[in-house]
Amino acid sequence: MGKIAFVFSGQGDQYPGMGKELSEKYPVAASVYAMCDGIRPGTSAQCFEGTVEELKETKNTQPCLFATELAATSVLKDKGVLPDAVAGFSLGEVVAATVCGIFDNETGFRLVCKRGELMQREAEKFDTSMAAVVKLTPEQVVEICERYSDVYPVNFNCPGQITVSGLSSQMTDFFSDVKAAG
């Protein structure tokens, strides 16, 4: 068999019911959710039964995605599938660091719980929004952002996708400019 890499996603891949079947079928996955519930009560319930709106709240998204990604990984490891490499994007970087042993499971989970709380708290201070811009070059996105006092490229995700964030009052016009640019 060739090399195996585990790649972990960031916020945005959450969905209601995530991990429920995994937890019901594999005791090792259920034990991950139990560990998470012991630290942050209700995490598994949010994963399994939470609404789209609840899971969009960063304070919930971060712990729920971490728990689900760690649970899935625990099943693979239990079946003898071990990674030769790990990688992650944003939140996924913390999962990757945990899976490869930089953090133990509890420390990794506590970290993302705190991270989610802090991100949520800061986001609530201002009326902001963010979105991924696709099909424009980085130069085009930066040029459009520079037209606004409070709109910024915040993450160059991959070729052809750039996350932009700013005050909601300016983002509507920003989106119009993006649409006009292509």
Protein language model regions, located:
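Surface-exposed loop/turn and secondary-structure junction residues enriched for glycine/proline
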Residues: 18-21, 25, 50-51, 58, ...
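Residue-level preference for short coil/turn positions at secondary-structure junctions
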Residues: 1-2, 82, 126, 158
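Short, electropositive, low-hydrophobicity segments enriched in small/polar residues
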Residues: 9, 14-16, 21, 92, ...
